[in-house]
UniProtKB/Swiss-Prot annotation:
Belongs to the metallo-dependent hydrolases superfamily. Urease alpha subunit family. The lineage of its organism: Bacteria, Pseudomonadati, Pseudomonadota, Gammaproteobacteria, Moraxellales. The active site is at H319 (proton donor). It comes from Acinetobacter baylyi (strain ATCC 33305 / BD413 / ADP1). Ni(2+) 1 binds at H133, H135, K216, D359. This is Urease subunit alpha. Keywords: Cytoplasm, Hydrolase, Metal-binding, Nickel. Its EC number is 3.5.1.5.
Length: 566
């Protein structure tokens, strides 16, 4: 029996050679491989395959998947592949072909009475997003981020304090302990950052031992060369990452002094971008350093006709500045430069900036990391054409580059990639399903550690799940006992060895960060470009390897108003 491509795609989803448009963008992906078997596909429902004696075997629970996602199109840094995905004990068990091995050939994911089915036909499956620039200003950020497809948040803070509103820091053992307890019921993998702005090591050591997963150097606390050097030395001692927001005012040194203080040690440079902060106007030059792992934040993503006007007011609020003080206004204006914002678009597209993040409620939008990433990719496709390596028929290389920016690369940077960051066997089953028309905008399901944690849901009193009003709601995996079995609190190895989780009576899964100190830009997936950078001190023109980087602001974007009428 033969089926037309259209009929096959409508029944089982796209297969090799089929192309899929991502939302209303100009980005198209093409299926590279299909791990299912034609004629042996499994699908659940009335008159379908996954029934007793057919696609469902008689095997016991230990031998079968707890959950199978059938016929999903995986989009990840390593490929764009159609497959069944088996989950077991909260982890990605196997990626391959699901079914009944007693009667079907080449089965790698046995199904049985213990198996739940999630229908992935016609849907895209991605890893949960990772946002590594979180200001813990309010706990409600978690729900907003989760509903957008983010499943891991790394940052610092204690609530709407002035220090937290400006800097991603949870300072000192008492705050670290109380915050670790406070986040224990939140449906999100979380790691806290401590304060790294110190010239002596012991106050940093005690924070690492108290449970932070990394350290933050921020100019508002004084990002001096001495503090940078000391912080990186302690980070090397304990194998934790350091994130830095450099000195916008160039008070304690210029960019060259900051880079010298790094001493070729690995560091995650926040705001390596056009307007977010750091050495003005040339923080973008840090991109050319192999030891620098650069990220930018979503308020400038992508460059549009409204970007400049929006930023001045945001900056005054976030950094506790007074519009009546001329020096404060000058500080704000020094950080917002249309030339460097435009260059940021292109540097993201070239793979020179390796990561995307939010800067939640501190100029960035916590629920828009994923949207802004794909809007940037779309704008660059329209303005710059196909990436090298992409054919005219698809954008697979560009899509892999951009999805790595908020999944695997932040996981590698912060030492979390042994647990999360990709759709790979053995990792925590943090997965997001998307209908292609809503890709990057509105997920159809968020799976957290193998449990459904969030999904759009209709009227609870309706006879079926779909009647209006439909909106995102927490599911069983987002409630406390579900959270404790499916979400990770990341700690330093020193804190784990010191029994911090037991002392604080933490109930979430606990995992260490590791392998953070020897990585370089070369370890970033699809984002390894290390150009020689130049920023003109007066015109702010940006050049990478001698090429002038400039582009026009967008006056219209996809993934925007047409998706948010209600």
């Amino acid at each position: 029996m033969k089926m037309s491509r259209r009929a096959y795609a409508e029944m089982f989803g796209p297969t090799v050679g089929d192309r899929v448009r991502l939302a209303d963008t100009e980005l198209f992906i093409e299926v590279e491989q299909d791990l299912t078997t034609y004629g042996e596909e499994v699908k659940f429902g009335g008159g379908k395959v996954i029934r007793d004696g057919m696609g469902q075997s008689q095997l016991l629970a230990d031998e079968v998947a707890d959950t199978v996602i059938t016929n999903a199109l995986i989009v990840d840094w390593w490929g764009i592949v159609k497959a069944d995905v088996g989950l077991k004990n909260g982890r990605i068990w196997k990626i391959g072909k699901a079914g009944n091995p007693d009667i079907q050939p080449d089965i790698t994911i046995p199904l049985g009475a213990a198996t739940e089915v999630i229908a992935g036909e016609g849907q895209i499956l991605t890893a949960g997003g990772i946002d590594t620039h979180i200001h813990w200003i309010c706990p409600q950020q978690v729900e907003t981020a989760l509903m957008s497809g983010v499943t891991t948040m790394v940052g610092g803070g204690t609530g709407p304090a002035a220090g937290t509103s400006a800097t991603t820091v949870t300072p000192g053992p008492w705050h670290i302990g109380t915050m670790l307890q406070a986040i224990d019921d939140l449906p999100m993998n979380i790691g806290l950052l401590g304060k790294g702005n110190l010239s002596l090591p012991d106050p940093i050591r005690e924070q690492i031992k108290a449970g932070v997963v990394g350290l933050k150097l921020h100019e508002d606390w004084g990002s001096t060369p001495a503090a940078i050097d000391n912080c990186l030395s302690v980070a090397d001692e304990f194998d934790v990452q350091v994130a830095i927001h450099t000195d916008t005012l160039n008070e304690s040194g210029f960019l060259e002094e900051t880079l010298a203080a790094f001493k070729n040690r690995t560091i995650h440079t926040y705001h390596t971008e056009g307007a977010g902060g750091g050495h003005a106007p040339d923080i973008l030059k840090a991109i050319g350093q192999a030891n620098v792992l650069p990220s930018s934040t979503n308020p400038t993503r992508p460059y549009t006709i409204n970007t400049i006007d929006e930023h001045l007011d945001m900056l005054m609020v976030c950094h506790h500045l007074d519009p009546a003080i001329a020096e404060d206004v000058a500080f704000a204006e020094s950080r917002i430069r249309r030339e460097t914002i435009a260059a940021e678009d292109i540097l993201q597209d070239l793979g020179a900036i390796a990561m995307m993040s939010s800067d939640s409620q501190a100029m960035g939008r916590v629920g828009e990391v994923i949207i802004r990433t794909w809007q940037t990719a779309h704008k660059m496709k329209v303005q710059r054409g196909a990436l090298q390596g992409d054919e005219t028929s698809h954008d697979n290389s560009r899509v892999k580059r951009y999805i790595a920016k908020y999944t695997i690369n932040p996981a590698i940077t912060h030492g979390l990639s042994h647990e999360i960051g990709s759709v790979e066997e053995g990792k925590l089953a943090d997965l997001v399903l998307w209908k292609p028309a809503f890709f990057g905008v509105k997920p159809s399901m968020i799976i957290k550690g193998g449990m459904i944690a969030a999904a759009p849901m209709g009227d609870i009193n309706a006879s079926i799940p779909t009647p209006q009003p439909v909106h995102y709601r927490p599911m069983f995996g987002a409630y406390p006992r579900g959270v404790h079995n499916t979400c990770i609190t990341f700690l330093s190895q020193a804190a784990i060895d010191d029994g911090v989780a037991e002392k604080l009576k933490l109930k979430k899964l606990i995992s260490p960060c590791k392998n953070t100190r020897q990585i370089t830009k070369a370890d970033m997936k699809h984002n390894t470009y290390c150009p020689v950078m130049d920023v003109h001190p007066e015109t702010y023109e940006v050049r990478a390897d001698g090429e002038l980087l400039t582009c026009e602001p967008a006056d219209v974007l996809p993934m925007a108003q047409r998706y948010f009428l209600f």
